Amino acid sequence: MILQQPLERGPPGRDPRATTGVTLGLDTREPLHKHFLSEENMATHFSRLSLHNDHPYCSPPVTFPEALPPLRSPCPELLLWRYPGSLIPEALRLLRLGDNPSPYYSASPAGEIMEL
């Protein structure tokens, strides 16, 4: 059982008792209203909930124009890209030692080679 004070109508964000300057004690307030929570009430509440966008508070779906034109001939090739941040330690080593730089996309160690 949940006990709750009745809602008071008035300007939003202001307590109507604050304008009159009257402070009421617990014994002079209006009686608390009882809200009984039962399994039936909860089942009814949850059965009304929905995961679909069929409620009036949902706006209709918006379609956006495509950012890229559709591909004329899509190809199944895979582009492997290596994050350039992994080359920072190599660049620092080259700056310290003055070595000749290796090719930008050098062969990876055997553990990193992938076959498709």
From Swiss-Prot:
What is this protein's record name?
Answer: Host cell factor C1 regulator 1
Q: Which organism is it from?
A: Rattus norvegicus (Rat)
Instruction: List UniProt keywords, sorted A-Z.
Output: Cytoplasm, Nucleus
Q: Where is the protein found, in the record's own terms? A: Cytoplasm; Nucleus
Disordered as annotated region, ranges: 1-22
Chain spans, region Interaction with HCFC1: 54-57
Give the CC-aspect GO terms: cytoplasm; nucleus
Gene symbol here is Hcfc1r1
InterPro entries from the UniProt entry: HCFC1R1
- Motif Nuclear export signal mapped to chain: 88-97
Q: Which PANTHER family match?
A: HOST CELL FACTOR C1 REGULATOR 1
Assembly, per entry: Interacts with HCFC1.
Q: Which domain of life is it from?
A: Eukaryota
